[in-house]
């Protein structure tokens, strides 16, 4: 995939997450590695709702902007540096997505990995980690980010208590779908907890063994590409401005 197509894919993922109610203000970044020491990442400023390919910067792993559209301000904030550290520590990770989905943020306050209650959540069974014992403010230094990077070297999804979530993948669309699945799992945990409290009934989670077995079975279904195509069809209806640029021809 060429750089223009990668930039558009980042924007499509961001726009869809916004449409799905999974972004907060202009917080959140999506990055994808393009060389040994550089990545594409959205600049700070525009929200996921309005992101365009011109908002995507080429940044090295020290946070230096190497290329940017001359029409935009190439401001690099602490969160972009967070992505750089994660990529530097984990060269095997292609894409990194960080945002603040409401259910994931809510569930993260319990400092607990969500239970698996449904078939879809089995796809991410055993893939979720919790980082930090408590919220310690913005992760603005490499010492603070290192635990995130180390956790993501072992698990592709991480909950940041009282903050948000980070998902990774072999490409942007995989990281995005994992974020959607994580948000769904957290939402169901919240709903199940509320139902249990209201009814006095005891919920039953899917056992770890059964969840992992279902995960293996679901992995045989090639759902990602048709799902991504469905997302694009929806975006062409809801966000036609994103597909009027020259890079849209590569989507």
Q: Model segments located where?
A:
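Glycine-rich flexible loops
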Residues: 1-251
């Amino acid at each position: 995939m060429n750089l223009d197509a990668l930039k558009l894919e980042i924007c499509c993922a961001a726009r869809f997450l916004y449409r799905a109610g999974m972004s907060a203000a202009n917080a959140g970044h999506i990055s994808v590695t393009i060389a040994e020491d550089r990545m594409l990442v959205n600049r700070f400023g525009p929200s996921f709702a309005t992101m365009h390919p011109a908002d995507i910067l080429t940044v090295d792993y020290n946070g230096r902007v190497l290329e940017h559209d001359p029409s935009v301000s190439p401001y690099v904030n602490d969160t972009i540096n967070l992505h750089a550290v994660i990529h530097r520590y984990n060269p095997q990770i292609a894409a990194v997505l960080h945002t603040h989905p409401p259910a994931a943020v809510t569930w993260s306050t319990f400092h607990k990995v969500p239970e698996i209650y449904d078939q879809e959540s089995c796809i991410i069974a055993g893939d979720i980690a919790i980082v930090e014992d408590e919220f310690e403010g913005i992760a603005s230094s490499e010492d603070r980010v290192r635990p995130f990077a180390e956790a993501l070297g072992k698990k592709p999804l991480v909950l940041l208590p009282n903050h948000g979530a980070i998902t990774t993948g072999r490409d942007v669309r995989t990281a995005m779908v994992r974020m959607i699945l994580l948000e769904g799992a957290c939402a169901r945990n919240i709903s199940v907890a509320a139902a249990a409290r209201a009814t006095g009934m005891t919920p039953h989670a899917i056992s770890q063994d059964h969840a992992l077995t279902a995960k293996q079975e679901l992995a045989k279904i090639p759902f990602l590409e048709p799902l991504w195509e469905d997302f694009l069809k929806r975006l062409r209806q809801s966000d036609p401005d994103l597909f009027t640029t020259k890079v849209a021809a590569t989507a």
